[in-house]
Amino acid sequence: MAETATLTLAPDVPALRPSYDVLVVGGGIAGMESALTLGDMGYKVLLVEKEASIGGKMILLSKVFPTLDCASCISTPKMASTSHHPNITTLLYSEIEAITKGEDGLFRVKLRKKPTFVDWAACTGCGECEIVCTVALPDEFNADLVARRATHIAFPQAVPKKAVVDRFGTSPCSFTCPAGVKAHGYVSLVRAGKYDEAFHLHMEDAPLPGSLSRACYAPCEGECTRGTLEGTVPIRAIKRFMVDRYYAAHPVPEYGPPETVRSEKVAVVGSGPAGLSAAYHLARRGYRVTVFEAAPKTGGMLRYAIPAYRLPKEVVDRDILNITALGVDIRTESPVRTLADLKAQGFDAVFLAAGTMQGFKLGVPGEELDGVTDCMGFLKRANGGEAMDLKGKTVMVVGGGNSAIDPARMALRLGAKKVIIQYRRSRKEMPAHDWEIEAALEEGVELQVLHTPKRFIGESGKLKAVESLTMRLGEPDASGRRRPVPVEGSEATTPVDLMVLAIGLKPSTAPFAAEIALNKNGTVKADKETLQTSLPYVFSGGDAVTGPSMIVQAIGQGKRAAFYVDRFLRGESLDGVRFEEPLPVVDKGEVVARTPNLTPLPAAPRRERPVAERLASMAEVELPVSEEEARKGASRCLDCGGCCECHECVHACPAGAFHFEMREEKAEEVVRSVIVSTGFKLFDGRRKPLLGYGRFPNVIDAMEMDRLLAPTRPYNTVLRPSDGKMPDNIAYVLCTGSRDCTVDHRLCSRVCCMYSLKQAQLILGALPLADVTIYYMDIRAFGKGYEEFFEQARGMGISFVKGKVAQIDEQPNGNLVVTYEDIEGGGGKRRMEHDLVVLSVGLLPNREALSLFPGGLLESDAYAYVREVDEDLDPGKTSIDGVFVAGTASAARDIPDTVLHSGAAAAQTAAYLKRMEKGS
């Protein structure tokens, strides 16, 4: 007999009192039987189950052999008894990380409680959340034959009957959004036809959906998992569809100011994306917000920097109504001279979002000439409605970023004869988005790379030409791009009527330099997390802090600032508080791996107006998608994170039970003994590729067939997966993954013959005219009534063919040809056609049981089952004193044997506890 193993605790570990007498690991039939037996003896039992319900695999079955009694009718009373037993505590949706035994004989159990995102104390199990959930995932209860919802109750007879939200992490599209917009959520809602709900979800995070649907650079699409396959989901186009549809139906917002208004006042300096976002979120919290804008109109960069052919100004106007509807007061032509003035006016906090509205100069001769301007100066005039006649003129734009592309394309629409973008590096190094560059070239903009202005040439104070130098690329600079080096003697002159300098923008923060700390580049010094400045009541964000950035980033900064301004005004600490902690991003490789049968759905190309039509007006270049196109595009979403955070369940729940802020919890318990009842694993038919499982839809395994036959089955009858046809010629292939050295599993699984006979008889009950054939090597009928059960099957007309199946091939009509060795017919190779084949897969050891105890202390037998020290004289006793094993964790067993073995394990545990009490 092997010696028992003990893990020694460090001497400074204090003595502990056990919380429970017994820990039972696993809530299947073995775990429940052991727990109930010990609970009835008066012992305190902790039952830990990793799923959201107890019941194990028995609850999945249709009926039990050989009596053909209802599996649910037997198991559900036991589940209820376990759940309500006064001496049993069930800890569901939890996993054990490690179990260690100390010198005091007690076991320390480290637990990981997985978040359900539902308060089970409040949940009534009504199922309303499942009805409205927009994400479909494979249904494990029905062997993945059909879908269930991400928010779901495990199965109809679940104990407890409580909802769980499947969140694998945050979807890459949502995780990468700087504003925290739940892209996965609104895409899923559009897919479900819930367009208004999609709009409202967006408004929870960002109040400028119309502007974002046109001018956002869509980092979400860049991270879309589908983009690694045949093309990204058109997230921005889907957003535009839902926004345009909503705005057409709602010219003004449906809501007004909040009912509860706080006494504190907040000033926002600047009405660009950051300022508007902060004002919106602060107003929703009940603050009285005033926005000060120096320009004649509201919108900042949205209005003055982005041309109408990309972002129509009526869309900006409608977006701004989302903010003013909350009671936000926006004062245009109201520049703020000092922050002290705002304090004197009674404002309790200030959000400084002055933006970057000033361009840099090149510092070359002639820059003061009439006809030399910066990109913001040019765009302000053009977008502000000032008449600019560029007909017949040559315009040059210096720079390689997006701020260079917009003036160039705008100049063409204003009638310029020739437009040149001059950039000192190569096109490869241009920071502008490639699609923007392509659009400019398509419209006729010339690209002059590896050139830079040396001086501007004028006549009578007006620009006439530019003298440029040719450049070559040298060694990389601090940015990682190769440094441009002038080529001596390469000067060349180009006639130019208008020069637009798009070489960068600087923040409009100079008026506040004496009051708050600024960086050398003029940006505001603000805490990266809280955005609080050197003046405690002043917060700052957007381009004023980051320098020139993207709209969505500025919106995110405004949202962040509102969170911390709210805490500041409530007198709460800003230290140690994190703003929006999403779940970790989902690994794209894992997403692709879990969708092996993905149907390729090519992405629809972006549609634009013809070039001639574009240049004739300021009409939007990009054309909208139709409702059908939007939903089709949304249907390509892979639901990377599981739950999409659409919050439909939150709105539908009458008990208010959903809490998406839940996170994984760690816990420790101390117990006196352990029963391992982790059950078994089923053989994966894919490991026998010649049998076609996973390749041919009409090759299924026995668990899938059990679900098709169960009273709670996914369909009204037995249907084959490929076409929904009722099969009339069904085959069973026994010993799939059992007694097979090619898959390293030499053992007989004991139950496959009988469960196949059970299913065959049930099939004849459901499909009386069906032909059922069982391919077998031999039939194991060792239990009480098993031989009679076999004879009963033969008497019902089920065919038995003694022979080993070698291969299964699919016919064009979905039928399957089975190639087998006909042992009783002379041993020759035969072929038989069936329209559905069931693989009677074997039972495998659950190796997770061995990993519960660090260091390999829990020994296994030669087949990786938990080893019993002496299965005849000491059934259930393992290599660790005080640890016992029950059911199929130690060997393949049928249900009656599992119940008996669990009783033995419980008896052994009780005897061990008595010995501990006596100190022997």
For each feature predicted by the language model, list its residue ranges.
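Non-heme iron-sulfur electron-transfer modules
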Residues: 2-13, 51-77, 91-122, 134-172, ...
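FAD-site-proximal beta/loop scaffold in flavoenzymes
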Residues: 8-9, 139-161, 368-393, 476-548, ...
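Phosphate-coordination loops involved in phosphoryl transfer and adenosine-cofactor binding
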Residues: 19-21, 93, 120, 262-265, ...
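Beta1-alpha1 glycine-rich phosphate/pyrophosphate-binding loop at the start
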Residues: 20-84, 149-153, 172, 178-192, ...
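A Rossmann-like FAD-binding core segment of flavoenzymes
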Residues: 77-119, 312-361, 373-391, 413-521, ...
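Short cysteine clusters
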Residues: 123-129, 133, 173, 177-178, ...
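Long hydrophobic segments that form regular secondary structure
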Residues: 391-425, 483-498, 522, 530-531, ...
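A conserved FAD-binding loop/helix module that cradles the flavin
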Residues: 407, 544-569, 743-755, 886-916
